[in-house]
Structure formats: structure tokens, C-alpha cells
């Protein structure tokens, strides 16, 4: 329970209005809640104030475009409506007060970058548990205490959802939380009032340009986590061009590299000296500001070496002994839908991965190649109603790194599948090794029945998702389930 006057110390407000929850969706309002009416990109919450009042809201905070109306109060019946200028920008701070600053009582790590956020946030929570913590995670796969994750709608939830979830985690006994921080979440100030013990930057490649319009805007949104928010420790991938540039501007940041020739400067640092890849993962010989050693990784692919080094560096910066981390690393498990290997005797190996950008697809194919003795197959599509510019680029990547390619459905949404396919096909130089099978299950079936034992089939784009969005309908679909059916 929180008194309304704890949020707004205004003379018009009585001291006896107690609130249960902050709620953005009028359909979820219950008696005693504070309804937050924000002007969103598609819907204006002010249109639903009457609905919220009908459901029993005890108070409303309403976004106004007029600065002169800021913190003025009007009443609808006995219910106060507090006008708030630039409410969306300040909502994280209001929710922080409402939920008693939960991030101050947690070790909170934010992870941002185009690729690797999910793997890193899941590994952080998993490793924290191995070190004796009660960990929680928020991101693409879902939110919740580790191993009790509930599916999420967005990578980074609303400002209210984030603070509310962190409060729930804290009261459930969590003392460590990792959170994926998307560029949308940063640009829209959804994580503004969080207190980060550390933030990790993975990489920056083309994605979300339908929203950000330019790579410069996209990079600027990501950078806010390291320059404008309350972030104590900054861990940055020095092998990324943008990351390397940021390191020159952030003298207190920690540099992480897979390059043995990386020149160590004034930063704290971690670098791989030698990497031996094998079918069960990789053995990483490293040097660092905290000592040297060999890290045995259970994850496949070069990019997962980078992911794991970023995670270990973060934990070292918190003061965990190197020997404890090396001992517990052997117990780490892979992440659902992230280079997830499915194998049956005498059948081709199937790898399911979430790769849905040109850079992620390239990294996934290179990683799959390391485990392929025969031909490498690539099954992929592109989401509808999203950045069309990346479609031919993904075709070029597939053609460069795979012997056999099948173009299929991803989540076409409301865009004609034929248009998506045409955009992809425009990127191929030669169609000889390309097949188009729109039905995704049939595409997977064809590849598994056509490939031989030493071949590897990468099914890219959906990863952990167990649905397809076709038109406005969401239908059940799992790459893993389909692959298992045809491998048996």
C-alpha cells in the first residue's frame, strides 16, 4: 500500500487515499489502484479514464501536453486526477517511489546490444544461482525468478512493469536480477530510475531501424545506459566498433576482447589468448586484471565465447574469486533457442537459434560451421511489418555461409508473404542452392529428410518462440517441436 501523497505532496489531496498498484491498462484496474493514463504511440490512455474509474481506481495520474497544467488536480466525483507534464519520461521515477526503490536492494545488471542480451542475462542469473544467490531475470524469454520464468510481451517492459516486477522479485527473496535493456526501453525512458550495479554492452549491428531511423540514433539510445543512467560498473565488448569507440570516452569502463593482440590501456580488462572449439563447447585461455586461467565453456560458437567472457568479467568486477567462477562455469547450461542443438543418432544435427538480423545470422552460421563436417543448411524468413532493408542482407549472408538455403515464413504479420520473399530473394546472386517453401513446418521437414548425417541444419529466426503471427492471429508453432517430430 502506498499513499497518494507520497507521490504527490499537493494541498488538494487528502492524506487518506491508499493505493494498491500502479496500472497502465484500464482493463486490469482493480479497486484501490492508481490508473496511469499515458499518451502512447498508438493509444491515448486518457480515453480510458472513465473505464478505470468504473473498475474502482482510487486515483488517476494523467499525461498532459501543457506544462502549465503540471501537477494540477481535478476531481471526477471523489476521485483525484493529477495532471502530469511529460509523464512517460518521468514514469520510471514515480514507479520507483511507489514500489520503494526495489533496484536499490538488488544486485541489478542491465544488458544491452543488438545480439547476445538474452544469453548473457540468462547466464548471469544462472551463474548467480550457482554462486549461492536467489536470482531473477527479465527479458525476451520472460520475467521471473530463475527457473520460474513467465512469458513476456516485450524485451523491456513498461516503466511500471519493471519496477513492479523488481519489487515482486525482492519480496520473493531474490537478491540478484539481470535485465535485458532494449534500445526502445532506453529511448522511451522505461529504465530511467533504476540503480544498476553494472551494465554490459554486447555489440551494435543493424536492427530496429524502422523505429530509430538511423544507426546513429540506435547507438545513442544504447549509450544512455552508460552515460546518463545510474550505472556503477560498465563492461564493454572492445571487439565491437562502437564498443571500442565508447571505451575511449569512458575511462572507468572495463574492456573485454576475444583478440589476443588487444592492446591493454588504462582500463581494467579481460582478453582471450587462445580458444579451442570442440563439439561440446570451447576451452578459453584468458588473461585479465583479475588473473589468468582456462574457462571451459559448455556453449557453442565464437560469439558465445564473447558472451561468457562478458558475464565472467562482470562477476569478477563484483569481487567473486576467479577460482570460484572457473569451478562453477562447468555447470552452466545453454539457453533455450540460442544455438540450441538437437541431435539424434544417424540424423543431421539441427540447431535452433533466434538469429533475426544479418549480423546474428552470420554469427550463427559461422558457429554452426564449426560443428559441421558435411553441408550446412540454413532455414530462415523475415518478420512482416518490420525493417525491409535487412531482408536482402540476410539473403547475402545465407548465400555466403551455407550450402543449402530454404526461405520460409517467420512472423509475416499483416504483410503478404510474397512481398517478404521478394525482398529476401533480391539479395541472392544465384538461386541454384535456394529453395522457397513458405510453410515453415514443411521447410523443416524437407531439410531434415534431404540432409545426411554429417550435415547441420540451422533453423534461424524464432528461437524460444512457440508461436507464429500470421495476419492478426497468433498460432502455436515451435521449431524445436517440429524438428524433433521429423528427426525421430
UniProtKB/Swiss-Prot annotation:
Binding of ATP, residues: 113-119
InterPro entries per the UniProt record, alphabetical: Mur-like_cat_sf, Mur_ligase_C, Mur_ligase_C_dom_sf, Mur_ligase_cen, Mur_ligase_N, MurE/MurF_N, UDP-N-AcMur-Glu-dNH2Pim_ligase
Name used for this protein in its record: UDP-N-acetylmuramoyl-L-alanyl-D-glutamate--2,6-diaminopimelate ligase
Gene that produces this protein: murE
GO CC annotation: cytoplasm
Keyword Magnesium: yes
Alphabetized GO MF terms: ATP binding; magnesium ion binding; UDP-N-acetylmuramoylalanyl-D-glutamate-2,6-diaminopimelate ligase activity
Residues the entry annotates as binding UDP-N-acetyl-alpha-D-muramoyl-L-alanyl-D-glutamate: 24, 26, 41-43, 154-156, 182, 188, 190
Residue(s) carrying N6-carboxylysine: 222
Organism this protein belongs to: Haemophilus influenzae (strain PittGG)
Family matches, as NCBIfam families: murE (TIGR01085), PRK00139.1-1 (NF001123), PRK00139.1-2 (NF001124), PRK00139.1-4 (NF001126)
Pathway connected to this protein: Cell wall biogenesis; peptidoglycan biosynthesis
HAMAP family, per database record: MurE
Residue ranges of the motif Meso-diaminopimelate recognition motif: 410-413
EC number per UniProt: 6.3.2.13
Enzyme class of the recorded protein, top EC level: ligase
